[in-house]
Curated annotation (Swiss-Prot):
Family matches, as PANTHER family: CYTOCHROME C OXIDASE ASSEMBLY PROTEIN COX18, MITOCHONDRIAL, OXA1
GO cellular component annotations of the record: plasma membrane
A Gene Ontology BP annotation from the UniProt entry: protein insertion into membrane
Phylogenetic classification of the source organism: Bacteria, Pseudomonadati, Pseudomonadota, Gammaproteobacteria, Cellvibrionales
Annotated protein name in UniProt: Membrane protein insertase YidC
Length: 557
């Protein structure tokens, strides 16, 4: 009995420690500057101001990370004329994107349906941007052979019909950037679809020459190592790269890994992504092509996530196309599932994803019925409690019987307290005589721990709960309770539940158990309100069930 109780206490303490560390990593990696700590003098504010064309021209060529690839074809000389790049702004119902005509790079992505701060309704979330304080951009091009992009050639100098595009009442908006080579015309086409964060990037090559035209499509995500400011006790979720490989459906490649050396893999299809809390950017190259992936740190100190597709060849006097998808938006599980296999795994539900994923679908279904995520969490808690009703009842019956045996156990302790072996033997005889399973109160609780851990990660990772209100003072279920009312209620319910449990025979164990409500209350003050809400409701239901069972057993004598 003692070893199992000790194991249960140890398991709870270990889980608490792990969750606390995940929540309190703000003190680590101080050598990496955070975005919030950058100097105040920023040349281009995140959203309100649009960088000038001159700024675009200088920033676009600052990082020489264009791949130099070998393709058997007649090279095309770079144009000699003076080129003035332009910044193209595209606005849909969910995105505002800024594209540089010098290379056709994505320099800024604003998510119009997501706020940077819930307190400011006029400030949408800026996912990607480039200014003096921060670099996070996406690039793509055609390199090698006849391609206009390259480390030596520089970037393709595109022209555009206009610099502002809006979706309006249409389902799609198409932005064409054009480039005239000596014997070919290249159109880089961006297609934006209503209510979608996936941008189709397609190259249309019209070969006017008598020889084949050939180049390789590449795409890059370039980001510095700065991290968002999470604030005091703020959770530090994973920020870094992730990729799918032939061996592993989802593999993280951290910035530290790239500091140690490049990560390379070649496969058919696939994807490469940069993930952060709630949001993701990802290149999804041609699914039927063999693509080479490389994740590395550049000489400029930025992290480069790159794919290079196989050679695209266009026959003489023919038209050819090659395209890739670029996603920049929230980590919505259903959207990501539709885009590419295993891309939904970037929603990091931890090693218990196979439990957390069904929990989210259940929560999402309930939310569709009630329209409030807080109410949905309460109803999901009731559902989970119903699933574990009988295992919990077994546990509470065992605990109630153990409470009845405490006077006899105390008597045995006085009689055989110095002889632990004799004491253990007499306890087992007592359990057998009274038909009590000393393990019955612990095992059902251990069975429920994976569900709690899964629910923790599900609530932490679900962008759907970001900035979502419950009622009254709780206006965001994804952050801590501002008044700490829920954590205090959680501590009270834990204390009441302990009073219904048998007192551990070991004084040290008893002291540890007495301190747990206080420790958990302090810890949960900094947990998301949605998670604490689950715990409070679960404890309340458990108290009700345990009280009824304990009272019935005590009445039965």
């Amino acid at each position: 009995m003692n070893w199992l109780r000790n194991s249960l206490i140890a398991a709870i303490l270990v889980i608490t420690y792990v969750l606390f560390i995940r929540w309190n990593e703000f003190s680590e990696r101080q050598q990496v500057p955070t975005i919030a700590n950058q100097p105040a003098a920023v040349t281009t504010p995140a959203y309100e101001a649009v960088p000038s064309d001159d700024a675009v021209a200088s920033s676009a060529t600052e990082e020489s990370d264009v791949p130099e690839v070998s393709v058997s074809a007649e090279p095309v000389a770079a144009p000699k004329a003076v080129y003035q790049p332009k910044l193209v702004t595209v606005k849909t119902d969910v995105l505002e994107v800024q594209i540089d005509t010098n290379g056709g790079d994505v320099l800024q992505v604003v998510l119009l349906k997501h706020l940077a701060d819930k307190a400011d309704d006029n400030q949408p979330f800026v996912l990607m941007t480039q200014n003096s304080a921060h670099t996070y951009v996406a690039r793509s091009g055609l390199a090698g052979g006849n391609g206009p992009d390259g480390a030596k050639k520089g970037r393709a100098k595109y022209s555009v019909a206009k610099t502002n595009y809006s979706l309006n009442s249409d389902d799609q908006v198409v932005v064409d950037l054009t480039l005239d080579q000596e014997n070919a015309q290249i159109t880089k086409r961006f297609t934006f679809t209503k209510s979608s964060y996936l941008i189709d990037v397609e190259y249309i090559i019209t070969n006017r020459a008598d020889t084949p035209w050939a180049a390789k499509l590449y795409g890059q995500i370039i980001r510095d190592g700065s991290e968002p400011s999470y604030g005091y006790m703020g959770m530090r979720p994973y920020l870094g790269a992730a990729i799918t490989t032939p061996e592993v459906n989802y593999e993280k490649v951290s910035f530290d890994d790239m500091d140690d050396g490049p990560f390379k893999v070649e496969q058919k299809g696939g994807w490469v992504s940069l993930i952060q809390h709630y949001f993701i950017s990802a290149w999804i190259p041609p699914k039927d092509a063999t693509n080479s992936y490389e994740l590395s740190k550049s000489s400029k100190g930025n992290y480069v996530l790159r794919f290079i597709s196989e050679t695209t060849t266009v026959a003489p006097h023919s038209v050819g196309t090659v395209k890739a998808g670029f996603y920049a938006g929230p980590k919505n599980i259903r959207r990501l599932e539709e885009i590419s296999p295993h891309l939904d795994l970037t929603i990091d539900y931890s090693f218990l994803w196979f439990i957390a994923k069904p929990l989210f679908f259940a929560l999402d279904f309930i939310h569709g019925l009630v329209g409030n995520w807080g109410v949905a969490i309460i109803l999901l808690t009731v559902l989970i409690k119903a699933v574990f009703f009988y295992p919990s009842a077994m546990s509470y019956r065992s605990m109630a019987k153990m409470r009845k045996l405490q006077p006899m156990m105390a008597e045995l302790k006085e009689r055989y307290g110095e002889d632990k072996q004799k004491m253990s033997g007499e306890l087992m005889k007592l359990y057998k005589k009274e038909k009590v399973n000393p393990f019955g109160g612990c095992l059902p609780i251990l069975l429920q721990m994976p569900v709690f851990i899964s629910l923790y990660w599900m609530i932490m990772e679900s962008v759907e709960l970001r900035h979502q209100p419950f009622f009254l003072w709780i206006q965001d279920l994804s952050v801590k309770d501002p008044l700490f009312i829920l954590p205090l209620l959680m501590g009270v319910t834990m204390y009441i539940q302990q009073k219904l449990n048998p007192t551990p025979p070991d004084p040290m164990q008893a002291k540890v158990m007495q301190m747990m409500p206080i420790g958990f209350t302090f810890l949960f003050m900094f947990f998301p309100a949605g998670l604490v809400l689950y715990w409070v409701v679960n404890n309340t239901l458990s108290i009700s069930q345990q009280y009824v069972i304990t009272r019935n057993i005590e009445k039965a004598g």
